[in-house]
């Protein structure tokens, strides 16, 4: 489908973006059931994530420290990080930090940003709730929590110092 004028090109671009968004939503819903588990390095997940979000990441400062291995469904974990990073890019301020750490039999994956403090972090995990002037459906963090629970873990959000922290934890096998 070739646009005939700039307005048509704009509409076509908008339609493509909406189809991509709806595709991601359907994929998120499909991943609510745990899939295959495999061991992999979180750095490998970052390579996939950065390729998917290449345009959104351009011009942004994202610091990545994912030095751990996990055993989980890689597609579900990719969707979790995609949702968390997408929110940080929409609502947060640079630098955005994506990191992992292990503590107490759990691996934690966090996306941290320097956005404004939020009034109700826990409420953001409810379906239909959005932070700020969001344009989405308010399902991103709800799906993050459900996916994390499907992997045997959980999701959380809090303010730590000058940063908003959105993360998930998974059990270490």
Annotate the PLM regions:
Residues 14-21:
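Short alpha-helical segment of the dimerization/phosphotransfer core of two-component systems
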Residues 31-38, 69-72:
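Conserved micro-motifs of the catalytic ATP-binding
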Residues 88-89:
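Short helix-loop "hinge" at the ATP-lid/N-box region of the Bergerat-fold HATPase_c
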Residues 95-105:
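Short beta-strand/loop element within the Bergerat-fold HATPase_c
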Residues 118-129:
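Short conserved segment of the HATPase_c
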Residues 135-143:
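Glycine-rich phosphate-binding loop
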Residues 152-159:
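Glycine-rich ATP-binding loops of the HATPase_c
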